[in-house]
Amino acid sequence: MKRLFLASEFFVVADHIFENFIKEKRLKVLFITTSSELHKEECSWVVKDRAAFVRGGFEVKDFTITGKSKDEITEAFASVDIIHSVGGNTFYYLKQIQLTDSADLYRDAVTNKNK
């Protein structure tokens, strides 16, 4: 069963999610950092979210959709068990989704069409 977790600070609730909903370890996480790209320095929440996954025993792959083709994004989505988008500038992220024509990939990932 697919599950969608929405959290403004994932690192705060990560342990609860891992203990109660995600029992498997060593799952692959696509860690999408696109929303945080406009910040000049790496954001504390990005560091903390990534660390929470690593601490939980997950394999984390940093990824941005900026400048990627739809095929590259499709391949990245298909290669992981979990897709995590970090917080940041939502409008910038949406613009990148539009530029890459990848909105349907996100929809399909949530509605279970591709897995």
Residue ranges and their predicted role:
Residues 52, 108-109:
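Alpha-helical scaffold elements within enzyme catalytic domains, especially in hydrolases
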Residues 99-107:
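Active-site glycine-rich loop that binds ribose-phosphate moieties when present
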Residues 90-100:
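Glycine/threonine-rich flexible loop motifs
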Residues 1-86:
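N-terminal beta1-alpha1 cap of cysteine-dependent amidohydrolase-like domains
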Residues 84-87, 110-115:
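Catalytic nucleophile loop
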